[in-house]
Amino acid sequence: MGDGLGVANLLAVLHGVGAGAMAGFVSGLLGVSPGGILVPAVCLTLGVDQHVAQGVSLIAQIPPTGLGGVSEYRRRGQGVPMPWIALLSAGFIAGGACGAVVAGYLSDRALRWSFVGYLLVLAVLAASRGRKQSTSMSEEPAVAPRRVALVGIGLVAGLSSGVLGIGGGLAVTALSTTLLHFGQHRAQAMSLILTLLPLTIPAAGVYVAQGWPLPWWSIAGVIAGLWGATAIGARIANGLPERVLRPTFVVLILAMAAYMASKSAQ
């Protein structure tokens, strides 16, 4: 990490805390893994390139920083069966390792535009689900989801995690509401529970092995910010109706896509 906590390292920690707190709050509020916010936030606050930002994001998501947020969702009755989490995790681990290897062969510009395209697809899926649900009173599936569907969602989330350096929660939330017909609160709870498991280790290990210059003091700050802010966001989310949460989720995705598109166009 360097030789002691000098002024430069202290600033790196504080910048990391700011990026982590921003990502953690949104993670708890919208039930997504923090990586989708963390990557652009790290690029903005630390001024690093896309590969380094993705490495920071993946490493910072190894500790169970979303524990407070998960507790808030469970306290409001939004539990998720552990067999579902196990199936998601199996797909995620396989996809994450493969995705990180692929990312190593892509340029920063290609990664950024891939990030933008991925976000736009998720926004369309989430918005489509919102329109369909407005005509139905049911917010939860009548039967348990098929195993292959959960593994498949985990695989897509893992691939996005490895290639784009995010936690995959955006994919879990968007796909579980669209394909499995989960209510927004249940989908967000499932996504956050997934963040408690150190599923980004394989992808993070690839980034470290490839020798990217990772800012370890900033990573420590990011972890601290994530830990403190996720529960606050989750507490607010549980007091909001679904008709508010879903449009907020879509707006967030579009805002992230717009920011990354502006970075890519420079």
Segments (PLM) and residue ranges:
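Juxtamembrane transmembrane-helix boundary motif
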Residues: 1-25, 33, 37-51, 71-164, ...
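Small-residue hotspots at the loop-to-helix junctions and early N-terminal turns
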Residues: 50-58, 188-192
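Membrane-embedded alpha-helical segments of transport systems
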Residues: 59-67, 94-95, 102, 193-201
